[in-house]
Amino acid sequence: MFPQIWGVIFLFTPTVFSELFKDPELLAGFYQGDIKAHPIRTRNGIVNQIYHWPNRTVPYMIEDDAFADSHYREILRAISIIEENSCVIFKPATEMDFPMALVITSKGLGCNTVHLGYRNKTQVVNLEIYPLGEGCFRIGSIIHELLHVLGFEHQHVSQNRDQYVSIQWKNINPQYNINFVNNDNSTAWHDFDEGYDYESVMHYVPRAFSRNGQPTIVPLREGAENMGQRFYMSEKDIRKLNKMYRCPDHV
């Protein structure tokens, strides 16, 4: 029997959520699955501009021999999607840019990011090799990690999440409870007046960190058909990014 919530049947097929209970964004054992350094408690997007990339520009380097040509091109496609929908620019890093640059590698387990936002030090994104369209090489998973780099946290821990989702603590593996603690009254981060977004590419899948195969995140309102999708930036993702980086022609 498929879980049915608000008249929506969630069909967790391999083409939608490959390896549902082995999602590579959750595998590495870091904070919230894919953030190595425990961040400031957040709402969803960072407000303080010291954590925004200077001049809206991210110098990046894709490690030599880390990826096949097809995977390299998919990373560039994800970068292009962000650039086309905002004023943020990713530019190949030079020696002058280091150590304040982004390094994209495939040496570790899963898909993960060292820090949220700009931290005046080298930022690293790991994308474990999977076939294109699966695991870390779902286009939305690459975008997800790049949005962490730009300053986004996961949607399900936003300050107002309890109005939109019910966290099923009984179904969560207890060692991962910290990954579901929300941001309470943090003022360091903001939703940029866009509100909660079930469709965000930053939202967990409904059964993230489940101990028993049952949902850990249950939507309380309609419109959650695509919760946890990894295919595209949602309209709210795009608007939040543009507001965060004060993009004059995109807000």
Curated annotation (Swiss-Prot):
Location relative to the cell: Secreted
Domain Peptidase M12A: 44-248
Record GO terms (molecular function): endopeptidase activity; metalloendopeptidase activity; zinc ion binding
Cofactor: Zn(2+)
Cysteine pairings via disulfide bonds: C87-C247, C111-C136
Catalytic residues (UniProt): E145
Tissue: Produced in the male accessory glands and secreted into seminal fluid. In mated females, confined to the reproductive tract and also detected in eggs laid by mated females (at protein level).
CDD domains per the UniProt record, alphabetical: ZnMc_astacin_like (cd04280)
EC nos: 3.4.24.-
Mutant lacking the gene: phenotype: Loss of cleavage of accessory gland proteins Acp26Aa and Acp36DE in females mated with mutant males. RNAi-mediated knockdown in males results in incomplete and delayed processing of Acp26Aa and Acp36DE in females mated with these males.
Record keywords, A-Z: Disulfide bond, Glycoprotein, Hydrolase, Metal-binding, Metalloprotease, Protease, Secreted, Signal, Zinc, Zymogen
Gene3D superfamilies: Collagenase (Catalytic Domain)
GO CC terms of this entry: extracellular space
PTM remark: Undergoes cleavage in the male during mating with a cleaved product detected in the ejaculatory duct and/or bulb of males by 8-10 minutes after the start of mating. Further cleavage occurs in the mated female. May undergo cleavage in a two-step process where it is first cleaved by Sems, making it susceptible to activational cleavage which may be carried out by another protease or by autocleavage.
BP-aspect Gene Ontology terms: cell migration; protein processing; proteolysis; sexual reproduction
Glycan-carrying positions: N55, N120, N185
SMART domains: ZnMc
Name of the protein in its database record: Seminal metalloprotease 1
Organism: Drosophila melanogaster
